[in-house]
């Protein structure tokens, strides 16, 4: 059995930054550190940080006065931000800068009283945070997930209308929704630069290349990870058997025992150690040396807040 590795795969710059913020805060301030929502959607990462003293909460009311609070990489609404400001808390923001970019687009539309449409998945924390940047009652903020949603949508003023997208969507699906928006509302204005982030786009491109060669595709990522789910869906659409797994223990031998080529990739919130463990398990099942495919090089780095820029070795 041949093992192929998608490239790029795994951690993106926003996830790296968010995890570093929690790790550095723990090193500097000590446990406990409170984090609103899972800092990134990966069980291994969250469990590791929890063992070191991070406490993951959903409501600001769960955080005691005087504590350290970190917002997750997915971002928060203005209401959550204001609630935290009203408390005696030290707050650090791990929102991915590419999510913050979308927040700024929504806030700008809100200030102008222009209606905005967000393409995204209802209930996802990034969507809740982005929708929560809009506050102008003279305008309006709407969520759509599919072309059908677009055709059912009515707005107050089609002349002043903009759209944004969640950063972790399927590129192909989003293109279909944008096409519907432009047909339904010919004067709608989109972002100057695509809101779907570079890491989402690159990983979907990489899994497409992987699925062209592999019979079975294993996507390392947690079930609540939007970008990881999109990778598995894309491979399935290409006619391949694709499975979303948290780690190597999820692999079922019957998935791969007849396969001549198995592809492995990882969502943007999955650490490489999990990929290494998956490769090791596949090798136990008869796989050869893992061969990385060529792909786009990623060298983007997002800095942590200056108060947390410290070499953890100096703190230990």
UniProtKB/Swiss-Prot annotation:
* Binding residue positions for (2E)-4-hydroxy-3-methylbut-2-enyl diphosphate: 41, 74, 124, 167, 225-227, 269
Q: What class of enzyme is it?
A: oxidoreductase
UniProt keyword list: 4Fe-4S, Iron, Iron-sulfur, Isoprene biosynthesis, Metal-binding, Oxidoreductase
Instruction: State the PANTHER family in the record.
Output: 4-HYDROXY-3-METHYLBUT-2-ENYL DIPHOSPHATE REDUCTASE (PTHR30426:SF0)
State its role.
Catalyzes the conversion of 1-hydroxy-2-methyl-2-(E)-butenyl 4-diphosphate (HMBPP) into a mixture of isopentenyl diphosphate (IPP) and dimethylallyl diphosphate (DMAPP). Acts in the terminal step of the DOXP/MEP pathway for isoprenoid precursor biosynthesis.
Self-association state and partner proteins as the record states = Homodimer.
Descriptive protein name: 4-hydroxy-3-methylbut-2-enyl diphosphate reductase
Lineage of origin: Bacteria, Pseudomonadati, Pseudomonadota, Gammaproteobacteria, Enterobacterales
């Amino acid at each position: 059995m041949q093992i192929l590795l998608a490239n790029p795969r795994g951690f993106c710059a926003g996830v790296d930054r968010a995890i570093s913020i929690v790790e550095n805060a723990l090193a500097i301030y000590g446990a406990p550190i409170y984090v609103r929502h899972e800092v990134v959607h990966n069980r291994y990462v969250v469990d590791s940080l929890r063992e070191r003293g991070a406490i993951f909460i959903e409501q600001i009311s769960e955080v005691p006065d005087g504590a350290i609070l970190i917002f997750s990489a997915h971002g928060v609404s203005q209401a959550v931000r204001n609630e935290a400001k009203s408390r005696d808390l030290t707050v650090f923001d791990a929102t991915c800068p590419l999510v913050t970019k979308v927040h700024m687009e929504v806030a700008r539309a809100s200030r102008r009283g222009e209606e905005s449409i967000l393409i995204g998945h209802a209930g996802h924390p990034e969507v809740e945070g982005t929708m929560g940047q809009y506050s102008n009652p003279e305008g309006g903020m709407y969520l759509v997930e599919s072309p059908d949603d677009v055709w059912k949508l009515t707005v107050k003023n089609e002349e002043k209308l903009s759209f944004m997208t969640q950063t972790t969507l399927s590129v192909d699906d989003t293109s279909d929704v944008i096409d519907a928006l432009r047909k339904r509302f010919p004067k709608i204005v989109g972002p100057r630069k695509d809101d779907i982030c570079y890491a989402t786009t690159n990983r979907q491109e990489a899994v497409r290349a992987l699925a062209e060669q592999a019979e079975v595709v294993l996507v390392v990522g947690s079930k609540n990870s939007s970008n990881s789910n999109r990778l598995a869906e894309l491979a399935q659409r290409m006619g391949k058997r694709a499975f979303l797994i948290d780690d190597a223990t999820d692999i079922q031998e019957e998935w791969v025992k007849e396969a001549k080529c198995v592809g492995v990739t990882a969502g943007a919130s999955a650490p490489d150690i999990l990929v290494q463990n998956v490769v090791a398990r596949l090798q136990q099942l008869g796989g050869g040396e893992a061969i990385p495919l060529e792909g786009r090089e990623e060298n983007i780095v997002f800095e942590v807040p200056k108060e947390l820029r410290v070499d953890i070795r100096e703190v230990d």
